[in-house]
Regions:
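Conserved small/polar residues in nucleotide/adenosyl-binding loops
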Residues: 1-9, 211-218
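N-terminal strand-loop-strand
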Residues: 3-42
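DNA-recognition alpha helix
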Residues: 179-187
Length: 222
């Protein structure tokens, strides 16, 4: 109920996936009417929190309600509290209609999850109006959600510098060196030197190299 909602605090979830070729982000469709015109755009899975739940509970609930995903590993990575977050009248009107309550300034806590894109994950997305969009194809989103995604990628790059194992959340247990190299190139948005990259893989304690015929260069497993 709207009376149970804490109107100044929300959570937004950035769920990043990898399909073997490109990085994707999980978005939900948004439809509304503004000044008599119907519009359709997209947003991150997010909403206001309830008075009787903590932030982590809210993030799990919102992600499940909007996408059907549950038991996903979510971690807080940043708070977004710009005074201009709710300055767009279209966003404010949409949120007030959705929550059936007047909305003022809102601070959001952003959560990040890295997941494998597979059929099990995707089985409930359509009925929840959720879908995977390639990062390079993301258009203008609601509120400051483009900025939140940008900051999520910055966080991932900084984290991976010290702990590359984070990226293995995006891969199956067995993967090729080429797939891992592609993933690094997408995350850092630059071409990776093949020879140096293979040396880097060989030094990773949590990677077991599997050489398969006829080509021994691409076999690897985590």
């Amino acid at each position: 109920a709207a009376s149970d909602v804490y109107k100044r605090q929300s959570v937004d979830c950035v769920v990043i996936g990898f399909d073997g070729e490109q990085l994707k982000v999980l978005l939900v469709k948004r439809a509304g009417e503004d000044n008599g015109e119907v519009y359709h755009d997209m947003k991150l899975p997010g909403s206001l929190i309830y008075m009787d739940e903590d932030l982590d509970e809210a993030a799990q609930r919102v992600l499940y309600e909007l996408t059907g995903l549950k038991n996903v590993n979510l971690m807080q990575f940043k708070a977004f509290g710009s005074k201009n977050r709710t300055s767009n009248p279209k966003d404010v009107r949409w949120l007030e209609r959705a929550m059936q309550s007047r909305v003022e300034r809102i601070v959001t806590i952003a959560y990040l999850s890295m997941v494998k894109i597979d059929r099990t994950l995707d089985k409930n997305l359509d009925e929840h109006q959720a879908c995977w969009i390639a990062l390079k194809e993301v258009k203008t989103l609601a509120f400051d959600h483009n900025l939140i995604i940008k900051e999520a990628m910055t966080y991932i790059r900084q984290f991976v510098e010290f702990n590359p194992s984070m990226l293995f959340e995006l891969l199956s247990r067995k993967f090729t060196a080429a797939q891992l190299r592609t993933l690094f190139e997408l995350v850092y948005d630059k071409v990776v030197d093949v020879r140096n990259f293979h040396k880097k893989i060989a030094m990773m304690e949590y990677v077991c190299l599997l050489y398969t015929s006829p080509s021994p260069r691409d076999g690897a497993t985590s």
